[in-house]
C-alpha cells in the first residue's frame, strides 16, 4: 500500500501528484485491473503468448 505524508508547506495538489506517481511506480492500479475479474488459465496463457510474440516482433 502506498502512503504519502503531506509535508509542511506543501499543497494538497503536490501531495496528490506524489501519491499518484508512487501508485503508478508500484503498479497498484495495473494489478487491480488485472485481478478485477477471474481470468481462465487458457486465456492467461493466450495473453502471455501474445505478449511474447509482440516482444519478439520488435
Curated annotation (Swiss-Prot):
One of its GO terms (molecular function) is structural constituent of ribosome. GO terms for cellular component: ribonucleoprotein complex; ribosome. One of its GO terms (biological process) is translation. Residues 43-58 have a biased composition (Basic residues). It holds the Pfam family Ribosomal_S21. Residues 27-58 are annotated as: Disordered. The keyword Ribonucleoprotein applies. Belongs to the bacterial ribosomal protein bS21 family. This is Small ribosomal subunit protein bS21. The gene is rpsU.
